[in-house]
Amino acid sequence: MLHIVKYLEKLPLLSAYLLDGDVVLLTENAIYATAVHSPYRASINDQNLWLVLYEDLHARGWLEKCDPRISVVTMSEFVDLTVTHDKSITW
């Protein structure tokens, strides 16, 4: 399943619903969780693929602050993710 997270405050809830192999894409204000010292960083685990949208990082001046362990994807790649995952949920 593809989990699209737009709001930081939804990250703690998300962990209860994640299954191994699910993909999480951070967008909009949820990109702030990608900072190495973010209090929300603890919500990001190693059992899932965590991605962040480049356009939102760039728009918020957050490119240099993003944890390098989180993969950055473009809008085009985001579209591809929605095509390859038959189920998605937005948080």
Functional labels for PLM-detected ranges:
Residues 20-21, 47, 85-86:
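Short, well-ordered alpha-helix to beta-strand connector turns
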Residues 23-28, 49-56:
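Short internal beta-strands
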